Amino acid sequence: MKQLFAVLLLVPVLAFAQKQPQGVTYDAQILNVTDGDTVVISAPFLPAPLKPQLAVRVFGVDTPEKGHRAMCPSEAQRGEQASAFTKNAVAKSVKRQVVLYGWDKFGGRVLGDMILDGQSLRAMLIANGFAREYYGEAKQSWCN
């Protein structure tokens, strides 16, 4: 428990300073896929009064936005495709783990990675063209 708090409170600054941050790994029950690079997990390891659910954004990637957050119709379409890819990857996986690195820069989500049957969701998103590497710099447009 103390290890988790150390990670969640102290690592956010370091997470953006390095491309391979150290994290804490847990078996994960994925409750919802929010978009291509964000999932909601069950987090029974968190103490009360924290919510037993945690939004986890995949560290080191940017996927296209979907819906009203997209800057153009092609980005919205690509965002839906990225979300569908993540949902499918989660659905067909048997062993699901999450590696938590620390809070994102806005504090509402935790940065991490999903390990699905031993494969990094981050790596799968990039390899299949649904994400770009992203470490906090200005984002590239998906509308080109």
Model-predicted regions and their roles:
Residues A15-N144:
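Small beta-barrel nucleic-acid-binding modules, primarily SNase/OB-fold domains
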Residues Q3-V13:
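Sec-dependent N-terminal signal peptides
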